[in-house]
Each structure stands twice: as C-alpha cells, then as structure tokens.
C-alpha cells in the first residue's frame, strides 16, 4: 500500500480544519481561474439583480483546484445557506428526496463527486433541477402511486473530477459549467502569499517560488507544502523562509524540483534501470516498484503522463526522454520524446535554429 504523499491532490481528513481557515470567502480573494471567475461573477450578479436563485452550477476539473471553495463562494455571494453532501452518500432516490424536501428557498445544495450518485437518484434530480418538483413513490407493484412534491427554488452546485461520467441529461440541466485548469507557478505564488499572511509566516519571493514550483499546479498541494516547510523552519530556528530553507525542507520530505515524490521516482527508475525505458506492462511495473497496480495507475501515472515523463502505448509504459534527463541518465538513441529535447541546447536551454532543408523526394 502506498504511503501518504505530500503531493497527492486529495484532501486528508485532518487537513479539513486548516484548509477551511485558508479558503477565500469571496471571488475577489480567489486566486487564479480568471475565465471561470469572470463568467461566474456575471452569472451571480445577474441573479442578485433579478432577485432570484442562481442557475445550477457545475464545476469540473482535477482534485485540489478549488471546486469546493467556489461552491462555498457561490452561497456566500448569493447570501444563501449552504447544504453539503456528496454523490457516494446518495445511493437511493429516497436519500436525495430527504435532502431536497428539507431545502429552504434560495438555499445552495453542494454535491461533491456528483458523478458517483446512483442512477435512480440522478433521474430524480432531473425533475428537481428543471421543475423544482419530485415524485415520491408510495407503495409497490400495481398499487404504487406517485405523489408530486413541490420544492422551493434552490441552486444546485455540482463538482466532479470526471465530467465524462455524467449523463448528458444531467449535464444539460446546469446553467453554468466551469472547468478548472491547473495553476501556473506565478498563480501558485499568489496563493502561497495569501496563505502565508493568514499563517503569519515570513517567506521571501524566492521561497514562494521554490514551493510553488514543486506543487504540481495545485493550490491544495501548495498549501500543504507550505505548512510542512513552516514546520521545518520552526524546528530549525529559521525566522524567514527563503529558497534554500524551502528546498532543504522539501528535499527532506522527498519532493523534488518537479514535484515528484518517492513513488513517482521509483516508477521512472524501474522503467529505466530494470526495463531499459520500456515498454513494460502495468502489472509488471507495479510488481517492480512493490505497489498495487491500481496505485501506480491512479496515483503516480496521471502526473507523470501530464509532465511528459511517462508514456502509455499499446505495448506498455515507456520512459520518455525528459524522464531520463530528470533522473540524470544519458538518453539512449531512439528514446521517444528525444526529438523535442533536441530542439533546445542541452546546456543553455536556448532554441536550436538551423537552415531548413526540404524533404528528399
């Protein structure tokens, strides 16, 4: 079983209180996601001007980018109470009916992991979202009757990491859909500056940059790394965190310059040293690193593929040229991805230009 990772995007239970304290409370304080913020701000402002509940909202994107925070901001901006539940908790239509029937007018219902809701509950949600009404079935068999239950107008905010699993009829009932993207390093630095202020930490610009560069483009990870660097600084008597102290702290936690942790590096090391860069089957690779197949596939692979370090092919997994370079190995001829590296000077990083020649006929 994989040990807990500092760079896993999922939220740990013990982090929830700290995360809640660091969450922005309004759109003005929310850093990043400029396009989604601008569009959402307009939707909410128009709803307030009309004096009506906001349209139903769906946020999609990888974990840790702010979907839950934005749901809370929707409720705050609409000055409405917030009810929180999740897809896995709603396994029967009756579970959903109980929640919907207790909503007050204008209330915001947040359903996290909405794609994991049961199909009967999804079908009940269609009518609730569109007509603010549900049919409660009483009895069984031929004697069963449907009793209509009117609902007060409410706003549903759904969040999903797998929008493709949502049925089309459900997606179509959301009046606004916002897809959240990974953050740039400068955006993460802004997130860290805000969090450091709330935590009363002294961090210079180089320190913020060092932490942001290892945060995988994810604010949740950035805040987690900041707290671990804070612990290191406290124990070592460091008053102001700079690049050197941040690097020393994160090196101790085995989070490298690219944000790779022990498992990530183990996967790449095994690919290169045991299988010559691949291709190798997923199950064989998992055995080589001493982890479950699902752990390698769901925990390590997404980030490695996104960073261009690992490739998936019909014949198996392969180590891309940047993986060889990152781990300090010489790249053998024919490694996939080497062509992209050869466009740049390996020492200076400057683009290599040459005289263009037409292909031979």
Curated annotation (Swiss-Prot):
Name the reaction it catalyses: ATP + H2O = ADP + phosphate + H(+)
**Region named Head domain (RuvB-H):** 257-361
Pfam families, per this entry?
A: AAA_lid_4, RuvB_C, RuvB_N
Show the segment(s) annotated as Small ATPAse domain (RuvB-S): 184-254
- EC number(s): the record gives 3.6.4.-
- Which terms under GO biological process does the entry name? DNA recombination; DNA repair
> Which UniProt key words apply to this protein?
ATP-binding, Cytoplasm, DNA damage, DNA recombination, DNA repair, DNA-binding, Hydrolase, Nucleotide-binding
Binding-site residues for DNA, renumbered to this chain: 312, 317
Instruction: Give the residue spans that cross the bilayer.
Output: none
Q: Which SMART domains match?
A: AAA
- Which is an annotated GO molecular function term of this record? ATP binding
| One annotated Gene Ontology cellular component of this protein | Holliday junction resolvase complex
Q: Where in the cell is it found?
A: Cytoplasm
Region annotated Large ATPase domain (RuvB-L) sits at: 1-183
Binding-site positions, Mg(2+): 68
Positions with a binding annotation for ATP? 22-23, 64, 67-69, 130-132, 173, 183, 220
Which InterPro entries is this protein grouped with? AAA+_ATPase, AAA_lid_4, DNA_helicase_Holl-junc_RuvB, P-loop_NTPase, RuvB-like_N, RuvB_C, WH-like_DNA-bd_sf, WH_DNA-bd_sf
Q: What does this protein do?
A: The RuvA-RuvB-RuvC complex processes Holliday junction (HJ) DNA during genetic recombination and DNA repair, while the RuvA-RuvB complex plays an important role in the rescue of blocked DNA replication forks via replication fork reversal (RFR). RuvA specifically binds to HJ cruciform DNA, conferring on it an open structure. The RuvB hexamer acts as an ATP-dependent pump, pulling dsDNA into and through the RuvAB complex. RuvB forms 2 homohexamers on either side of HJ DNA bound by 1 or 2 RuvA tetramers; 4 subunits per hexamer contact DNA at a time.
Family membership? Belongs to the RuvB family.
Q: What is known of its domains?
A: Has 3 domains, the large (RuvB-L) and small ATPase (RuvB-S) domains and the C-terminal head (RuvB-H) domain. The head domain binds DNA, while the ATPase domains jointly bind ATP, ADP or are empty depending on the state of the subunit in the translocation cycle. During a single DNA translocation step the structure of each domain remains the same, but their relative positions change.
Subunit details:
Homohexamer. Forms an RuvA(8)-RuvB(12)-Holliday junction (HJ) complex. HJ DNA is sandwiched between 2 RuvA tetramers; dsDNA enters through RuvA and exits via RuvB. An RuvB hexamer assembles on each DNA strand where it exits the tetramer. Each RuvB hexamer is contacted by two RuvA subunits (via domain III) on 2 adjacent RuvB subunits; this complex drives branch migration. In the full resolvosome a probable DNA-RuvA(4)-RuvB(12)-RuvC(2) complex forms which resolves the HJ.
Tell me what this protein is called.
Answer: Holliday junction branch migration complex subunit RuvB
Source organism (scientific name): Pseudarthrobacter chlorophenolicus (strain ATCC 700700 / DSM 12829 / CIP 107037 / JCM 12360 / KCTC 9906 / NCIMB 13794 / A6) (Arthrobacter chlorophenolicus)
